[in-house]
């Protein structure tokens, strides 16, 4: 499965399978080095990016705790 392309993710969707297949829809200032497919969000100003990789493994923790 390799390295998770994001250390944490707030907008994460994962399948119910084991291992899970996860995507992260967080808007990033830049993608991590581990992210292979980085897509620029159209019309974003300042520019924002989404890592379009699908990660197979343990879901990432959330970046921000919801108060």
From Swiss-Prot:
GO molecular function (one): serine-type endopeptidase inhibitor activity
Domain of life according to the entry: Eukaryota
Stored InterPro entries: Bowman-Birk_prot_inh (IPR035995), Prot_inh_BBI (IPR000877)
Disulfide bond sites: 8-63, 9-24, 14-22, 31-38, 35-51
SUPFAM superfamilies in the cross-refs: Bowman-Birk inhibitor, BBI
Transmembrane parts of this sequence: none
SMART domains: BowB (SM00269)
Keyword entries, A-Z: Disulfide bond, Protease inhibitor, Serine protease inhibitor
Signal peptide annotation: none
Site (Reactive bond for trypsin) residue list: 16-17
Pfam families linked: Bowman-Birk_leg
Listed CDD domains: BBI (cd00023)
Family: Belongs to the Bowman-Birk serine protease inhibitor family.
Protein name as catalogued: Bowman-Birk type major trypsin inhibitor
Species, as recorded: Setaria italica
């Amino acid at each position: 499965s390799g390295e998770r392309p994001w250390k944490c993710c707030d907008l994460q969707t994962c399948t119910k399978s084991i291992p899970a297949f996860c995507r992260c829809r967080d808007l990033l200032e830049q993608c991590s080095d581990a992210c292979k497919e980085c897509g620029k969000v159209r019309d974003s100003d300042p520019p924002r990016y989404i890592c379009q990789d699908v990660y197979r493994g343990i879901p990432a923790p959330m970046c921000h705790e919801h108060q």
